Structure formats: C-alpha cells, structure tokens
Amino acid sequence: MLAFTLRFIKNKRYFAILAGALVIIAGLTSQHAWSGNGLPQINGKALAALAKQHPVVVLFRHAERCDRSDNTCLSDSTGITVKGAQDARALGKAFSADIQNYNLYSSNTVRTIQSATWFSAGRSLTVDKKMMDCGSGIYASINTLLKKSQNKNIVIFTHNHCLTYIAKNKRGVKFDPDYLNALVMHAENGKLFLDGEFVPG
C-alpha cells in the first residue's frame, strides 16, 4: 500500500511537471508562428515593428521562371512568366502596405530584374551583380548596400541558392524557397541577423 501511494505521488509529480511544460510551450507557440523548416514566420506587421528598431533586409527569390514553366512568358525567355509578374505585383502591393520606405536591388539576371520591377510598380531599381554570388561574401555585399542606402530598409531580389545558404549558415536550417519566398534580416552594430521567413498577411 505504501509503495502504491509513493508511486502515485511520484506519477502525479511527473504529470504536474509535464502539464507545466505543455503550458509554457503553448504560450510560446501562441506568440510566435514557426515555419515547417524551423524558421520563425514574420508577417507584415511584425516586419514593420522590426523596421522601427533596425534597418531590415528582405531577400526575395525571383518570381516564376519562364524557362521552367508552361505558363506564358512575360517577354524574354530567360525572364519570368506573366503569372509570375502578376504574383510579384500582388506581393509588392501587400508588402508596401506595411513597409513603404525601402531601397530596391536585384541581381543582374532578367528574372530578378523583372520580378523587382513588377514588385515595386515603378520604384527606382539598382542592379548589383554581387547578389548572384552567394557564399560567405554575401554579408559584406549586403552591408555595402545598406551603407549606400544610408541604413534605410532594403529589398533584394536574388536566387534560391542565396536564401538556402543564408538560412543554413545563420540558423542551421534547410530552406528550399519557392518563387517569391523571402528571408528577413536586420542590421545591428554592423552585423546581420536572420530573423525568419517573411509570410505576407
């Protein structure tokens, strides 16, 4: 009987610990959404709040490629599709509802230039070929753009291998971005930090 009582008390203690842990986890989950890849999800409102504290860097993968789709090409076969252009325009409109003040950059490919142009609907675009080369040097290139932008927010249209590299290098996660997926970073004291994946809405 004594052994049963002790075991019952012990089990109740474990149950209480487990219940407490679940409450903590539930609380954290309610405050922060996470992508299936392990990256925090950052919507437009959260991005705007972050931008009030630090200059933000949003790196988008280009829109749907013409040469890898059966959809109608926008123009050049090395560029994006009509659907990709429409998707970029819709995304840019939603993005600008929360972030109006930013400088726009892209790598020097037709698909990134077209994506950035349709995303911004007329905003001035600066093409930088370094946004095509993604390795350890990408951070220095981004910091250079931040300095040129006088620490304003910047939006960069680049490529899937760049986003994959940054996610792996900064957070150790596997990120396989679809068209127009994006990562959010911020600059602080000359360093770049990966905050998560941008999720419109």
Swiss-Prot record:
GO MF assignments: phosphatase activity
Induction profile: Induced by BasR.
Biological process annotations from GO: lipopolysaccharide metabolic process
Subcellular location as annotated: Periplasm
EC number of the protein: 3.1.3.-
Tagged with keyword Signal: yes
GO cellular component terms, A-Z: periplasmic space
Signal sequence range: 1-35
Matching InterPro entries: His_Pase_superF_clade-1, His_PPase_superfam, LipoPS_heptP_Pase
Pathway(s) per entry: Bacterial outer membrane biogenesis; lipopolysaccharide metabolism
Keyword Magnesium: no
Keywords tagged on the record: Hydrolase, Periplasm, Signal
Role played: Catalyzes the dephosphorylation of heptose(II) of the outer membrane lipopolysaccharide core. Required for iron(3+) resistance.
Family statement drawn from the similarity comment of this UniProt entry: Belongs to the phosphoglycerate mutase family. Ais subfamily.
Protein name per Swiss-Prot or TrEMBL: Lipopolysaccharide core heptose(II)-phosphate phosphatase
Species of origin: Salmonella typhimurium (strain LT2 / SGSC1412 / ATCC 700720)
Gene: ais
